[in-house]
From Swiss-Prot:
<dbReference type="GO" id="GO:0003677">
    <property type="term" value="F:DNA binding"/>
</dbReference>
<dbReference type="GO" id="GO:0046983">
    <property type="term" value="F:protein dimerization activity"/>
</dbReference>
<dbReference type="InterPro" id="IPR045843">
    <property type="entry name" value="IND-like"/>
</dbReference>
<comment type="subunit">
    <text>Homodimer.</text>
</comment>
<dbReference type="GO" id="GO:0003700">
    <property type="term" value="F:DNA-binding transcription factor activity"/>
</dbReference>
<dbReference type="GO" id="GO:0005634">
    <property type="term" value="C:nucleus"/>
</dbReference>
<feature type="domain" description="bHLH">
    <location>
        <begin position="144"/>
        <end position="193"/>
    </location>
</feature>
<keyword id="KW-0238">DNA-binding</keyword>
<keyword id="KW-0805">Transcription regulation</keyword>
<feature type="region of interest" description="Disordered">
    <location>
        <begin position="109"/>
        <end position="153"/>
    </location>
</feature>
<dbReference type="InterPro" id="IPR036638">
    <property type="entry name" value="HLH_DNA-bd_sf"/>
</dbReference>
<protein>
    <recommendedName>
        <fullName>Transcription factor bHLH113</fullName>
    </recommendedName>
</protein>
<dbReference type="GO" id="GO:0006355">
    <property type="term" value="P:regulation of DNA-templated transcription"/>
</dbReference>
<dbReference type="InterPro" id="IPR045239">
    <property type="entry name" value="bHLH95_bHLH"/>
</dbReference>
<dbReference type="InterPro" id="IPR011598">
    <property type="entry name" value="bHLH_dom"/>
</dbReference>
<keyword id="KW-0804">Transcription</keyword>
<keyword id="KW-0539">Nucleus</keyword>
Amino acid sequence: MGDTAEDQDDRAMMEAEGVTSFSELLMFSDGVLSSSSDHQPEGNVGDGGEDSLGFVFSGKTGSRMLCFSGGYQNDDESLFLEPSVPTSGVSDLDPSCIKIDCRNSNDACTVDKSTKSSTKKRTGTGNGQESDQNRKPGKKGKRNQEKSSVGIAKVRKERLGERIAALQQLVSPYGKTDAASVLHEAMGYIKFLQDQIQVLCSPYLINHSLDGGVVTGDVMAAMKAKDLRSRGLCLVPVSSTVHVENSNGADFWSPATMGHTTSPSLPQGF
């Protein structure tokens, strides 16, 4: 079949524009397609059709897209794309077409996201309940520990108060009763007792040497034998101390009674 006058005009116009391939046609402006579509008959404008160059286009009701599959050029159902809003259900998309209707896929994605978010919320609430249940024993344990520590502190405070009161009765029964004053008085009292013990023990702690000479082994034995006498002490039989049992010790050691307390039964060595 020979080319018609309209086909020759379209080819001449494409050659004038420098379009030689399909890629250049896609990158080119819509002027060529619009010019080619102007030559179509008015009855086919609403339904779409095929121009003289073999390109498929859709009408006003559908999306204006191209389909490059040569096997579907004679099939009216595959030539025209479905409208953007489907009437019902999810339609299968033609892999040979450029246009991809993602509205249904977005709906599916939103459904998946909503289900995931709901499951996350459920799991989150479950984990929160479990965490609360796990935290409750810890709080109870802390409260029990605090109560036990408070009870121990009270017992220690009571014991300390009792000891302070007993110490206050010893050092200053009619003085101050606060802990600081009682401890201060106790320190002074202890120092006084230490000084008294040192004064009373000083005569008995002096070591006397024999004439200031060198101490030999024999002298050491004699010093050990006279150790008590050298320290001002002596051994007295129990029978000689019977008359001192009912008397006052201070009067017994007074100078007035020292001469009358000598017993003839005492040995000469004492």
